[in-house]
């Protein structure tokens, strides 16, 4: 292994850089370090303080942002000092340790992106089996595997396959990519190419399914949005549907195209951020491994390294603030009642559990997982998330909703929307049924109950995807039948009414269903 003294002669030329270049590089790395630290710290604190946000998907996000936070605290400060002084002054031991730490954190971050892509794949394509495939234990095992996988990719330089040294153009200690082309190729494939392939495959399938669903909805339903003013001056969308195979309504084509663009943009942002931040760095180290150390311009080498650091800035933005629930809680923590109260008054706290939310939020809503989990638990304990089931009749068409409310907003939610929808939680319903039950009921086999429960929930999710594949938080308030399609609409409404089920209780595997009151 090489120390800082091994490259003293080489560093003499780098130290002679002109003043403006030195100042620009130093300012840039300082800004990058501050942004990485603040951005990831905000997401880590938000997820930690709001424990109900730590769904399985968000646990992966927490691990990702926490590792980036470590990078900003344990690695980048020394890069800043080296960039200013134009030399490494912290000794050989810390040089080797910081190089190993940088490679470990960077590798773990890239592999975590692949794990998140797999998580999204199951959440979007197989929502019914998601709680069984992605469990808490498996999530922990996945995170442990990520770090062990990364460690395997970073240890070879300590055992003689390549070396660790201070790079005078990257201004940090890192593996000597130009000395061992074999190790450079191994690290790129083991820690970067594998998660990239996983991301391409998973997000490709996600977009394909979203596009197919959008086409089916577009061909079978014409959506007309009518604006109706409310007392507070805001507008509420009312929707009327009719069966039609033609594109007579221009607005439906706009909605169809916009929804596809919405999913496509989300996926492109995820893939594009990975390629743009890590792509140049991979090209630089590959060129060094094949053609030698001086084959790349020092300026390009520095820029590529700095650009790879910016991936840690993108992660909290894409996987944290892009999530509506996390963003809401973050703003609530920053502005308190000035933001939280208007938010609950202007936006519905119940929203459709749709494919749109699963794709664009990039974090699975914990409510379906909690809903499924409650069906198999023998002990009914209240959680931090008040997950309930309700039926809404506000537009003439009953729609199954999964309540998206936290404990501090439950009471306000019931007051505001008591006239529009009825909501009942699992815990309250279980207590009511226990008090009111005077006649013994015939027991139902747990396997049959779970099958019926899964079938009804699958039908509801299927109807949600067909009605509102990329719906907004506020579901349209009116559904009107267009002239000339009354028979078809009547059949559609009758079919929807068959799906109006309300989970009454879950106790010892006994699941009962009944129609919601219209």
Curated annotation (Swiss-Prot):
Keywords: Cell membrane, Cell projection, Cilium, Developmental protein, Disulfide bond, G-protein coupled receptor, Glycoprotein, Membrane, Receptor, Transducer, Transmembrane, Transmembrane helix
GO MF terms held by the record: G protein-coupled receptor activity
Function of the molecule: Key negative regulator of Shh signaling during neural tube development. Recruited to primary cilia and acts as a regulator of the PKA-dependent basal repression machinery in Shh signaling by increasing cAMP levels, leading to promote the PKA-dependent processing of gli3 into gli3r and repress the Shh signaling. In presence of shh, it is removed from primary cilia, preventing its activity and allowing activation of the Shh signaling.
Residues with glycosylation annotation: 2, 96
Region: Disordered, residue numbers: 429-448
UniProt entry tagged with the keyword Membrane: yes
GO cellular component, one term: cilium
Record's compositionally biased regions (Polar residues): 439-448
Species for this entry: Xenopus tropicalis
N-terminal signal peptide: none
A biological-process GO annotation: adenylate cyclase-activating G protein-coupled receptor signaling pathway
Cytoplasmic side of membrane: 48-59, 119-138, 207-264, 323-518
Annotated family: Belongs to the G-protein coupled receptor 1 family.
Name of the protein: G-protein coupled receptor 161
Record's bilayer topology term: Multi-pass membrane protein
Transmembrane portions of the chain: 27-47, 60-80, 98-118, 139-159, 186-206, 265-285, 302-322
SUPFAM superfamilies for the chain: Family A G protein-coupled receptor-like
Topology, Extracellular side: 1-26, 81-97, 160-185, 286-301
Disulfide topology: 95-173
């Amino acid at each position: 292994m090489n120390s800082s003294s091994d490259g003293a002669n080489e560093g003499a030329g780098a130290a002679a850089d002109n003043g403006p270049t030195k100042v620009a590089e130093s300012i840039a790395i300082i800004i990058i370090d501050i942004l990485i630290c603040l951005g990831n710290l905000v997401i880590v604190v938000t997820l930690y303080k709001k424990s109900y946000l730590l769904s399985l998907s968000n646990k992966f996000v927490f691990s990702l942002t926490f590792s980036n936070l470590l990078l900003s605290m344990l690695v980048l400060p020394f890069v800043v000092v080296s960039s200013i002084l134009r030399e490494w002054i912290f000794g050989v031991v810390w040089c080797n340790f910081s190089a190993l730490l940088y490679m470990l954190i960077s590798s773990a971050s890239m592999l975590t992106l692949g794990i998140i892509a797999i998580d999204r794949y199951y959440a979007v394509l197989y929502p019914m089996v998601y709680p069984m495939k992605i469990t808490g234990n498996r999530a922990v095992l996945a995170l442990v595997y990520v770090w062990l996988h990364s460690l395997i990719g970073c240890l070879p330089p300590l055992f003689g396959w390549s070396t660790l040294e201070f790079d005078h153009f990257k201004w940090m200690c890192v593996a000597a990519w130009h000395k061992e082309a074999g190790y450079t190729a191994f690290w790129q494939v083991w820690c970067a190419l594998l998660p990239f392939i996983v991301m391409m495959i998973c997000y490709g399938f996600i977009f394909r399914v979203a596009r197919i669903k959008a086409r089916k909805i577009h061909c079978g339903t014409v959506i007309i949005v009518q604006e109706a003013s409310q007392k507070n001056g805001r507008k509420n969308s009312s929707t009327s549907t009719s069966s039609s195979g033609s594109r007579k309504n221009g607005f439906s084509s706009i909605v169809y195209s916009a929804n596809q663009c919405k999913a496509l943009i989300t996926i492109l942002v995820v893939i594009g951020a990975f390629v743009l931040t890590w792509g140049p760095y991979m090209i630089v180290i590959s060129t060094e491994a094949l053609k030698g150390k001086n084959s790349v311009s020092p300026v390009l080498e520095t820029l590529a390294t700095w650009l790879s650091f910016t991936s840690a800035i993108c992660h909290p933005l894409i996987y944290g603030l892009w999530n509506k629930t996390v963003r809401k809680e973050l703003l609530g923590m920053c502005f308190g009642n000035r933001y939280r109260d208007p938010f609950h008054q202007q936006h519905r706290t119940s929203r459709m559990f749709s494919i749109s939310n699963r794709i664009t939020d990039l974090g699975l809503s914990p409510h379906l997982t909690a809903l499924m989990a409650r069906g198999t638990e023998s002990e009914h304990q209240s959680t931090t998330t008040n997950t309930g089931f309700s039926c809404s009749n506000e537009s003439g068409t009953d729609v199954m909703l999964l309540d998206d409310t936290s404990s501090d907003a439950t009471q306000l939610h019931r007051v505001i929307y008591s006239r529009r929808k009825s909501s009942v939680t699992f815990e309250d319903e279980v207590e009511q049924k226990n008090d009111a039950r005077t006649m013994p009921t015939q027991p139902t086999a747990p396997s049959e109950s779970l099958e019926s429960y899964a079938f009804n929930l699958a039908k509801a999710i299927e109807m949600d995807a067909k009605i509102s594949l990329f719906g907004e938080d506020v579901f349209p308030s009116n559904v009107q039948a267009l002239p000339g399609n009354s028979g078809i609409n009547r059949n559609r409404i009758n079919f929807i009414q068959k799906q109006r089920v309300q989970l009454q209780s879950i106790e010892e595997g006994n699941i009962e269903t009944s129609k919601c009151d219209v």
